Amino acid sequence: MVRDTYGGAVDPLEPHPVTGQPSTSPAAPGGGWPGDPATPDTPVARTAVQVRRLAASAADVGELQARISVCRACPRLVRWRESVARDGRRAAFADQPYWGRPGPSFGDPDAEVLVVGLAPAANGTNRTGRMFTGDSSGDFLWAALHRTGFAALPTSVGAGDGQRLDGMRIVAAVRCAPPGNAPTGAERATCAPWLHRDLELSLPRLRTVLCLGGVAWTATLAAARALGWDVPRPAPRFGHAVEVPLRAPSGQVVRLLGCYHVSPHNTFTKRLTAPMLDAVLASLREPR
């Protein structure tokens, strides 16, 4: 066994499935994982107070994602994401290193569209290090993003595969994989400042926030209020293809757009179909 940056025991070096670069599980900051935004010197948030301070002081999208990717403020989530990376890997991925850290955003830092999901999956983003990558939810989403011209490739395998987004960036309401896909209220609140700063840094280019599911919708409305945006009251209810105009203090109007989440629960039951998702994504390109 070797030791990671924080002094914890980790698995020996294993080859990254895309690049072949040796990596530990979890991936050490600055240890060579492709696309890792952090370095060994990136400041680490260990409390909710530190999350607020480090989020607010991040100068740009890159610095913010680096700080997000090393956050350790929620002990339950840290234990879970790292235990999966070390001992709970799915059999199909048992010979692969796992990212095992919070999921940074992925996409265009100057995006006009911000896509907000719920949280990483234990064997998806927590394995690959990229939002909505490595599970069936991601497969459904990336195929649609490619069909509608946002994604360079129809699939997303993992960091280093050449995938890129044009005019779009993907974030999440909670950045760590939670047990049972269910973060607690306290964990959502601790993580919220990261989303707040993601919204701030997206202005003035931001035109639309696309929320995948009700949790993302609620988190985005809360973030907008915290930033002093003009948000309708009572709070607009989430629904598929529901649109709500939000106004930033600068006067800029940002469209909030709802979409059913791309989870298997919705796609297998046909609550969300490929044509439905394509229509929502196509509307992002319509002039406003």
Language-model features: locations:
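A polyanion-binding, active-site-adjacent surface
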Residues: 6, 13-246, 250-287
